[in-house]
């Protein structure tokens, strides 16, 4: 009798522990997905903000200024490089004349 009661309690506890781990797993996956969406949204907003090139036509000045839209680094002015992900001219971390 005592063994059956212990066995029943043990099974009940195992089920509770399994449910607790499943709940933690669901929370972890949900948290990761939420963080991923936040990062994607931030990148999309930054790209949208700076994708429109409101500056002068690049043919008029020969190069694109800071945050101007580009496809390759050669389109950007001196000390600027075309950002791989957002496709705008960003500082290339060089200093000089």
UniProtKB/Swiss-Prot annotation:
Localization per Swiss-Prot or TrEMBL: Secreted
CC terms in the record's Gene Ontology section: extracellular region
Keywords: Disulfide bond, Ion channel impairing toxin, Knottin, Secreted, Signal, Toxin
Propeptide: 34-61
Predominant cellular place of this UniProt entry's protein: secreted
Signal peptide feature range: 1-33
Pfam families documented for this protein: Toxin_12 (PF07740)
An example Gene Ontology molecular-function term: ion channel inhibitor activity
Residue runs in coiled coils: none
Cysteine pairings via disulfide bonds: 63-77, 70-82, 76-89
Summary of the tissues where the protein is detected: Expressed by the venom gland.
Entries under InterPro entries matching the protein: Huwentoxin-1, Huwentoxin_CS1
Protein family per UniProt: Belongs to the neurotoxin 10 (Hwtx-1) family. 12 (Hntx-12) subfamily.
Function: Ion channel inhibitor.
Domain notes: The presence of a 'disulfide through disulfide knot' structurally defines this protein as a knottin.
Protein known as: U6-theraphotoxin-Hhn1a 4
Organism: Cyriopagopus hainanus
Lineage: Eukaryota, Metazoa, Ecdysozoa, Arthropoda, Chelicerata
């Amino acid at each position: 009798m005592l063994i059956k009661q212990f066995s029943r309690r043990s099974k009940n506890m195992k089920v509770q522990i399994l449910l607790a781990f499943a709940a933690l797993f669901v929370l972890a996956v949900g948290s990761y997905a939420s963080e991923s969406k936040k990062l994607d949204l931030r990148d999309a907003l930054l790209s949208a903000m700076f994708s429109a090139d409101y500056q002068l036509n690049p043919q008029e000045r020969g190069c694109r200024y800071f945050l101007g839209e580009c496809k390759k680094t050669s389109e950007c002015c001196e000390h600027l490089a075309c950002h791989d992900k957002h496709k705008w001219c960003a500082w290339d971390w060089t200093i000089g004349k």
